[in-house]
């Protein structure tokens, strides 16, 4: 049976390869995603990554750390890419973006079954030029 560690590694590999069909095979049929930007279920999770890949043609996901605790796996990732397409209504800026995430999954039946994450979305939208950078003045 596939371990949580293997699933978390494969997650990054499939996204970097822009292979959302392979990514979808990692998700349990009853997948629950607690990410507020994604629609419910497997389809919603695939759609949010489709949006990233479409907006950043060189989108890649790098594994920073994985902690496997049996039925729970935690991954820290860095996503990088050049913002060349519209993302969540933000027009292309051609800026290099970098997003850091902490993803927590519940593993069931050898698949990713439930997901929570923390993202630096404020910084991402600042990098895209959607909102001004904050300064200490």
Predicted regions and their residues:
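C-terminal and inter-domain tail/linker signature
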Residues: 1-137
């Amino acid at each position: 049976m596939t371990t949580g560690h293997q699933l978390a590694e494969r997650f990054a590999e499939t996204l970097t390869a822009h292979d959302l069909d392979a990514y979808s095979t990692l998700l349990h049929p009853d997948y629950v995603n607690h990410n507020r930007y994604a629609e419910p279920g497997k389809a919603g999770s695939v759609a949010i990554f489709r949006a990233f890949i479409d907006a950043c043609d060189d989108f890649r996901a790098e594994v920073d750390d994985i902690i496997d605790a049996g039925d729970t796996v935690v991954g820290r990732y860095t996503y990088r890419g050049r913002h060349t397409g519209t993302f969540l209504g933000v027009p292309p800026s051609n800026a290099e973006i970098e997003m850091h995430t902490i993803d927590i999954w519940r593993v069931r039946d050898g698949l990713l079954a439930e997901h929570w994450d923390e993202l630096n979305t404020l910084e991402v939208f600042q990098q895209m030029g959607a909102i001004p950078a904050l300064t200490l003045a």
